[in-house]
Amino acid sequence: MNPFVNLFIQHSKKQIFLNNNKNNILLNFNSKLYSTITYKNNNNNNNNQIINNKTIMKRKNNEIIQTEEDDDNDNGGIHDCDSCDEVDNEEIIPESPPSKKLQQQQQQQQQQQSKLKPKQTSITDFFSPTVKTSKADKISPFFSNVNNASTTNTTTNNKNVNKKTTTTTTTKKRNNKDEENEDDNEEEEEEEEEEEDKKSKKKTTTTTTTTTTTAYKKKSSPKKKKVNPTENKFSTINYKDDQYVQKEEYSSSKKEKLENVKIGGHVSIKNGYPTLIQSVVAQGFKAVAFFTNPPRTWKHHTVKLDDSIKFKQSCKSLNFDVNCILPHGSYFLNLGSPNKENLQKSRDLMIHEMKNCEILGVKHFNFHPGSHLNEISESESIKIVAESLDYILERTKDVVAVIECTAGQGTNLGYTFEHLRDMIALVKDKTRVGVCLDTCHMFAAGYNISTKSNCDVIFQEFDKVVGFKYLKGVHLNDSKSTCGSKLDRHENIGKGHIGTPCFKYLVNDKRFQNIPMILETVGPYDQEVKLLYSFIEDDDKK
């Protein structure tokens, strides 16, 4: 059986259809496609060679030899169709060999075509353009002209067998040379790429070495700073069992100050009373303030006995001085109110809060005296405050009622030392009455305590008018408002109009020792506590 191949070449789209047995193969190339299908037939019919896709079949002495495996055809690469039987009956008439001139012309044409021929791309899905042959018979490709391609080429191919054999040898040599040239070009390109890679590696190594050297220079060990032995090391404070004991040894006078100056802050009780003292000690507090009742309500909240027991135990275990606990009263309290209903509410609420202090074992309770509301005079309102204190002290035990000075905002009482003096003077049991000085309130009320000299004068006046024996607490606040503005606006220590001299004066004056000094600033309190303790001076070095 002889294969019958129909070539349909479309010049516009440059497509080739091969109809071979049951398979239709469509090939698309970006340029001219040169395909080769050779057919050799001798008169003895000893050898029949079929080239189909990737297979070359031989028929010799009624034996089929398959040179390559075929994965695409179902028939195992055997070409079998009825149309091919008709071709077997035709006779092939060999032509005389061509002359030398014709051979030279053909070679020149082939060389010109080879220059125009693009590089062949491998198509794994179909078959490679270069046809593989057996060792016995090597068949060279036949380059057909696309413009003159038609069905007549099949008959001319059968007639020009000798012509093919002569031309195939020349084309084989040319193809081998082309392949060698392509291999040489590929080798040269590979060598160039290797050289470029080496250069790039050298560059990267140089850059890495430079970066490592620069990084090494940057990572050089820093020079150690020389420490002066005379430098003040007070900034390092230990907050363990020995509170505020410094790493360096101090004189006895400074140690006494560190032990007797009681600084703390106003904290929340949202985490409960049992853990309150532990938390404030961890922040370096030696004094503390809190609300025993919500500050903006008339409702009464009673401290639980279990909480009070744990609170007392924590105070004893941590050696926390109970006299330095100064709870704050509700903002609704107005013991000088001209309104009888509100006056009674205020008295009942303060009684309840002072009883909470009794349950906790606390000995002092701080409150704002109230206001006259422009309905009565200041002196009349001060008398009502004193009467309210007598009423409350008769119904409570042991707890001292501590009157806080005010900024004089609105119609508030207590913005002068004389107001405080008159209230105390009218109270029957003076042992249970005390005073709390707020630095911001004093400054806003007109007491300019921004300098040390002014502090000397003002606190001497306080001692004459009221007396330090009634001083039970101090609120440490800087002021956002100016002196005499009568605006109660707290600021962090050293950041307001008062400045640090006043607070340095307070922590170094013995008259303020063992008195709770409470911060009511925005915080954080632990940093401000350290700052205030750093203001303590050594009297022996003066």
UniProtKB/Swiss-Prot annotation:
SMART domains: AP2Ec. Its main location: nucleus. Its cofactor is Zn(2+). Zn(2+) 3 binds at H441, D488, H490. It comes from the Eukaryota. Signal peptide: none annotated. Residues 179-196 have a biased composition (Acidic residues). It holds the Pfam family AP_endonuc_2. It catalyses: Endonucleolytic cleavage to 5'-phosphooligonucleotide end-products. The C-terminal part is sufficient to function as an AP endonuclease. This is Endonuclease 4 homolog. The lineage of its organism: Eukaryota, Amoebozoa, Evosea, Eumycetozoa, Dictyostelia.
